[in-house]
């Protein structure tokens, strides 16, 4: 058998973006090759050992709803699960899990090795094969030429990566891995707009040298234990472990200030911009000089290691300063550092040069996903990877690209922000970035996306069957609550007072009672001695049962707000999705200022909605664009009719 070198899709990179891209492309039926410099690091958690969080957990749930791997792998490797913002409204509740690094990698690799249509090969990529304006393949470090109609590039921090510890620096993609210098140089030859960003990681600590008696324990949620995947079960989780909390102090801060003269960030050695929402400890001390203390979370890296990740002290200070600052904190006085913290600078490419499909505008068939687009975080990378892999598969199948709208998914918000606004610093997802977050909750990610995923070919039969049962049960139970009534005669005053605070004075549906503050689904079902409960169990599986009850309760309690948001979405929909012609020259649009026409010509938005979110493009400019499109459409129709009349056939071609 000859060694295969012809594929439909090539994915370069085996991190969180690359693995989801390869799996999505292969699920689409495309013959897919995943190229990685080291098969042992597939799915590696390069920085913190956690998945999810505010906004990020929403992305993980959406990836799961579309058949992706991250949530399921976390359920198999998570050693602590928590629901953040559990006391707040459902829009901002988010799941977060600590993961065992080794188990997580194993779960991802198992899925890759057992995915039909997917080949793995260990080789770094040094070059892309480009013919004219389209990519046709990739060339590896030892000169193997793989051909494909689409290439998804997910290079993470490896593109011309430079690692900094104090004033010492060296090339690297992350600690222990080489940088992709040749590939970075090749991309620069393609004249794609690029820049430099920076991220960092803290020193790792040997747990045997930590005095836990001086620390505050932070356990996970135990009743119930959360799961990430809609198909997940708490029984899949390995042993659960606590995290621990310590704090910086004035001595810590003095040590850090004393080392700033050897900090690559504060001596101008690092030029790349770092993440605003995950700053280094030296940045925190500088920016929040009046703050006396910062909370530091000591997170276990896994069940088979003593290594701990001190979340909150990412740093590129010299190692002697790192050692001193760690020892200044309570419980860490004798801590042994296993690995030094460091910062890494790397190339990224302006995401405004991408289509919403994550295909580059300049080179057909070339897709970017993950940190190469200026984002930070495993979850943002995984979401982009799935979308890029899906659209690479659709590209080779000559199908239209797909991207969710802003009102449809956090993934839609993420991509729209990237391709219309670009990034000045590493982009992190928050719930505050979404205008319609009440409709984009974690709990309904499957309701929003799984049917679409099924149509796209991403969702398998097992997921579809489970989703269909849940969807139908939610619908039936919602209708039952709306059509089941209690009256002052049928609901004893004592029972009504116990649940509602007073007896009822007229007829109510169970749905109306559930809308009252402080009333739960279980409470309503307990009325009349349990007669208000459904006649048959909503589901046999306890996890699915809780999901159904949650969906029903939120849907009824927030019905008015959700309907109001849906009306707002409908009003905005017409302009949002109006497409702009590919070849339009905005200098010819009557009334547009020079600045606006210049920005529109530079960024080439695909829709009116995207154009409206470009900085400096005013509502008045959007109105002028709409007028121009109407005039242009009328002119094309008139021109086509006149041409048809001259030809004597009396037909008018349909305008696309």
Swiss-Prot record:
One of its GO terms (biological process) is tRNA wobble uridine modification. NAD(+) binds at residues 274-288. GO terms for molecular function: flavin adenine dinucleotide binding. One of its GO terms (cellular component) is cytosol. Residues 637-656 are annotated as: Disordered. SUPFAM superfamilies: FAD/NAD(P)-binding domain. Its cofactor is FAD. Its main location: cytoplasm. NAD-binding protein involved in the addition of a carboxymethylaminomethyl (cmnm) group at the wobble position (U34) of certain tRNAs, forming tRNA-cmnm(5)s(2)U34. Homodimer. Heterotetramer of two MnmE and two MnmG subunits. PANTHER family: GLUCOSE INHIBITED DIVISION PROTEIN A (PTHR11806), PROTEIN MTO1 HOMOLOG, MITOCHONDRIAL (PTHR11806:SF0). This is tRNA uridine 5-carboxymethylaminomethyl modification enzyme MnmG. It comes from Burkholderia ambifaria (strain MC40-6).
């Amino acid at each position: 058998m000859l060694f295969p070198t012809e594929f439909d899709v090539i994915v370069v990179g085996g991190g969180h973006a690359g693995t989801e891209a390869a799996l999505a492309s292969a699920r689409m039926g495309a013959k897919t090759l995943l190229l990685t410099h080291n098969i042992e690091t597939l799915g590696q958690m390069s920085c913190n050992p956690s998945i999810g969080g505010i906004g990020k957990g929403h992305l993980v749930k959406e990836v799961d709803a579309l058949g992706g791997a991250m949530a399921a792998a976390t359920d198999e490797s998570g050693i602590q699960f928590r629901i953040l913002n559990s006391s707040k409204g459902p829009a901002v509740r988010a799941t977060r899990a600590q993961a065992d690094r080794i188990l997580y990698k194993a779960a991802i690799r198992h899925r890759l090795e057992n995915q039909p249509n997917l080949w793995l090969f260990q080789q770094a990529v040094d070059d892309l094969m480009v013919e004219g304006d389209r990519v046709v393949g990739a060339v590896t470090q030892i000169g193997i030429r793989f051909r494909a109609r689409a290439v998804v590039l997910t290079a993470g921090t490896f593109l011309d990566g430079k690692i900094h510890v104090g004033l010492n620096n060296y090339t690297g993609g992350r600690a222990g891995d080489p940088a992709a210098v040749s590939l970075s140089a090749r991309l620069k030859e393609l004249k794609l707009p690029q820049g430099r960003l920076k991220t960092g990681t803290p020193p790792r600590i040997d747990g045997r040298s930590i005095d836990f008696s001086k620390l505050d324990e932070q356990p996970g949620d135990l009743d119930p234990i959360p799961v990430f995947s809609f198909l997940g079960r708490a029984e899949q989780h390995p042993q659960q472990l606590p995290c621990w909390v310590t704090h910086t102090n004035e001595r810590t801060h003095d040590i850090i200030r004393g080392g700033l003269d050897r900090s690559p960030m504060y001596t101008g050695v690092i030029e790349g911009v770092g993440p605003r929402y995950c700053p280094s400890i030296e940045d925190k001390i500088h920016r929040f000089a009046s703050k006396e203390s910062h909370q530091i979370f000591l997170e276990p890296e896994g069940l088979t290691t003593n290594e701990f990740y001190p979340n909150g002290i990412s740093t590129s200070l010299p190692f002697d300063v790192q050692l001193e600052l760690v020892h200044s904190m309570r419980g860490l006085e004798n801590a042994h550092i296993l690995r030094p913290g460091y910062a890494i600078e790397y190339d990224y490419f302006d995401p405004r040069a991408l289509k919403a499909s994550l295909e580059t505008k300049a080179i057909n068939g070339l897709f970017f996903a993950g940190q190469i687009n200026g984002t930070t975080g495993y979850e943002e990378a995984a979401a982009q990877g799935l979308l890029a892999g899906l659209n690479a598969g659709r590209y080779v199948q000559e199908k239209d690209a797909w991207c969710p709208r802003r009102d449809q998914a956090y993934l839609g918000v993420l991509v729209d922000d990237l391709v219309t606004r670009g990034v000045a610093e590493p982009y992190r997802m928050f719930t505050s970035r979404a205008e319609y977050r009440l409709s984009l909750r974690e709990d309904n990610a499957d309701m929003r996306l799984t049917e679409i995923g099924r149509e796209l070919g991403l969702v398998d039969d097992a997921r579809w069957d489970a989703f269909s049962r849940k969807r139908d049960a939610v619908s039936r139970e919602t209708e039952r609550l709306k059509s089941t009534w209690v009256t002052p005669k049928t609901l004893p005053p004592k029972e009504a007072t116990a649940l509602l605070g007073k007896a009822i004075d007229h007829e109510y549906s169970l749905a109306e009672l559930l809308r009252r503050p402080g009333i739960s689904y279980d409470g309503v079902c307990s009325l009349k001695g349990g007669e208000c409960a459904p006649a048959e169990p909503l589901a046999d599986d306890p996890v699915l049962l809780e999901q159904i009850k949650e969906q029903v309760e939120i849907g009824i309690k927030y019905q008015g707000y959700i309907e109001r948001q849906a009306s707002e979405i409908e009003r905005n929909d017409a302009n949002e999705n109006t497409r702009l012609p590919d070849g339009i020259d905005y200098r010819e649009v009557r009334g547009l200022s020079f600045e606006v026409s210049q920005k529109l010509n530079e960024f080439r938005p695909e829709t009116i909605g995207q154009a409206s979110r470009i900085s400096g493009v005013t509502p008045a400019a959007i109105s002028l664009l709409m007028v121009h499109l109407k005039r242009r459409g009328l002119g094309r129709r008139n021109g086509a009719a006149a041409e048809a009349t001259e030809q004597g056939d009396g037909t008018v071609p349909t305008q696309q």
